[in-house]
Every structure is written in C-alpha cells, then in structure tokens.
Regions:
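Domain-scale activation on soluble regions of proteins
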Residues: 37-45, 50-64, 68, 78, ...
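Short acidic (Asp/Glu) patches
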Residues: 33, 61-76, 85-107
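Conserved beta strand-loop-helix elements of the APE1-like EEP
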Residues: 15, 82-85, 174-176, 211
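A structured binding-face within diverse protein domains that lines the active/interaction site
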Residues: 64, 81-92, 106-109, 119-146, ...
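Conserved catalytic micro-motifs used in adenylation/nucleotidyl-transfer and phosphoryl/amide-
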Residues: 7, 48, 100-117, 161-225
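Short Pro/Gly-enriched beta-strand edge/turn motifs at strand-loop
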Residues: 28-33, 91, 153-155
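Extreme N-terminus nucleophile/cap motif
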Residues: 1-64, 181-189, 220-226
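Short histidine
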Residues: 118-175, 179
Length: 227
C-alpha cells in the first residue's frame, strides 16, 4: 500500500502580526508552477490555518486550486503564525473531498505533510481515510508524550520500520510558539527538499522558494526548529 501526498506547503512565524495576502499570492504562484515527479499539479484544493489572538487555530479550506481563489486572500486575518497547503490528490476517488485538505490541526498544533511512502504496513489500524491523516494520527500520539522535536524523530523511525521505501517525507508543524520541519527523501531532491528563509522578523519553511525571498535547504534527516 502507498501513502502519497504530492503537495506544496508553507509555515510562517513572524515577529509581528502580518496579513497573509502577499505571501499567499507568492505561494499560489509557486504551487501553480510546480509539478510533482510524475507530472501532477497541486490543483486538488488548498487550505490555510492561522493562529488567532486567543491562541486558537482558524481554518479555511477549498476544493479549488489555490491560484483560482486569489480573490479570497484579503479576507483572512493578521497573525504571527500561518500555515498553508496546496494539494495533489492520490486518486480520482480522493479528489473534491474537503476534509482531506490540509492543514490539519488539533489543540495547539497545526500540521502539514507531503511525500510518498511505499509498502506501508502496520499491525493495527490507524485512524484516517488517507495517508496524510494517518501520519497525523501517528504524530499526535507521539506529541501527547514527547516534545515536537522528539516526536518527529520518533515518527520517522516508526515509518522506517513499517514502510518498504520512503521516497519522500516532509512534515511541517507549528505549536503557536515555534515552527518545526522534518525532511528526508531517497530520490527527486529538487521536489522533496524543503527550504528555509530567516530574517530578523520573519521565518518561513517552504516546499519551494517563494519569489522575493532568499532560502537555504533544510538539512536532510534532521528536525529544523525555528524559535
């Protein structure tokens, strides 16, 4: 069995509250240009979460391509923490399902994923209809007992044990204090490598570079924690 989610995502931590409109336009342009290794577009919906002043995650999701909904970008609120995701569905039956669009969130955490896992086999059922939901279930279990950094490393070990091959595994996480990323791949590094931008006031984890920002690669096999 394969767990596949060929997607693009960004996670933002800002020193001050910012409006997401400008960065969403850049993200939408990047997602529109991007192609997965098998040629798919990230056109099967998108979502955005932002942390409100009362420390609760707000969310907007759509089954339309993100670049077709630029007229909505001005409607979202300012925030210091923003998470966005543009999706390429695994199968035709998986398209047009709003609940399958990320980000996923629970409690303090917002989560995004992209990657391809081959030969996935666990001894017990895992909650979730699709691969990204199941990975989120596994990560939540770890987050209930360990720090975000340790949870991401433990999740990687768990997937290594229960997958024949991990072609790509990219996870982004935000807890309303810091942002985190884990990145690994066995092929197609130009697609799977995450990027990181850091300035004195803004930090961005992104699937690909955004126009107007300087990025460096995220180290493979390590957790990036941006305080």
């Amino acid at each position: 069995m394969r767990r596949r989610d060929m997607c693009r995502f960004i996670i933002i931590k800002s020193q001050n509250e910012i409006h997401p409109e400008d960065i969403l336009h850049r993200f939408a342009a990047m997602a529109r240009r991007s192609r997965s290794p098998d040629g798919d577009r990230q056109s099967d919906g998108w979502g955005i979460s932002w942390l409100s002043n009362d420390m609760k995650w707000q969310v907007h999701k759509s089954i339309n391509p993100i670049w077709d909904e630029s007229h909505t970008f001005s409607s979202f609120s300012k925030s210091r923490f923003i998470v966005a995701h543009a999706r390429s569905a695994f199968s035709k039956n998986d398209k047009k399902v709003l609940a399958h669009n990320q980000p996923f969130y629970r409690g303090a955490y917002a989560f995004v994923f992209n990657g391809l896992l081959r030969g996935v086999s666990f001894s017990s059922p895992i909650a979730g209809d699709i691969g990204s939901q199941k990975i989120w279930t596994l990560l939540q279990d770890q987050l209930g007992r360990f720090s975000p950094n340790d949870s991401l490393l433990r999740l990687n070990k768990m997937l290594e044990k229960n997958c024949r091959e991990i072609e790509g595994l990219n996870i982004g996480l935000c807890d309303g204090i810091n942002i985190y990323a884990y990145c690994r791949n066995s092929m197609h590094p130009e697609y799977y490598n995450l990027r990181f931008h850091e300035s004195s006031t803004l930090k961005i984890i992104s699937s690909e570079a955004l126009d107007g920002y300087d990025f460096v690669p995220v180290e493979i096999g390590q957790v990036l924690t941006s305080y």
